[in-house]
Amino acid sequence: SASLVNDAVVAYVSGSGDELLVDVFTADEVSHLSDVRAVVSVGRIMFMLSGVVFFLVLFSGYWVFGVHRLVVLRRLLLYAGVINLVFALLVISGIVFWFDGLFTAFHGLFFADGTWQFSSSSNLILLYPQTFFVDMGTAIMKTFLLGANFFIVLGGVLLALEKKWLE
């Protein structure tokens, strides 16, 4: 069933399995899924590294700036929140108003020419139509929005505490 195929694809692409445990895709589709697996792996590493860098900057800024720690911490949180908010809103706008161009640009950036376009009768396209990618992109950007708002609110709380302590 489609659900079992999807589960196998998700396990493979996410790195949970060493090989794709279904035999419904062409060699080109399997090759593309292998490329997707590599992109997901690099993306996961970049996400973790960005988190480590963020916390290193946050904590080093906190310890380096002495009496101005709260100001620096608040600014870092607000800047991180605003940058993520703007990024997410730009990508969501791109998804809504320019999906084909954004999809093509993304694939052109991460995949070799001719390795990511398939016919409309392809099992890969039938299993993952355009609406899947619109929904997935929107869900990812909603997560960015939540994170951005968290940083902005936390920065605002620190601003309120800072003002209260200065009174």
For the regions a language model picked out, list residue spans one by one.
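Membrane-proximal extracellular/periplasmic loop immediately following the first transmembrane helix
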Residues: V10-Y12
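Juxtamembrane non-transmembrane "cap" segments at the membrane-aqueous interface
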Residues: V96-S121
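Juxtamembrane non-transmembrane segments of integral membrane proteins
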Residues: S1-A8
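Individual transmembrane alpha-helix segments
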Residues: S14-S50, F132-F144
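Terminal transmembrane helical module of multi-pass membrane proteins
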Residues: G114-E167
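Juxtamembrane interface at the cytosolic side of transmembrane helices
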Residues: G51-F97, I152-E167
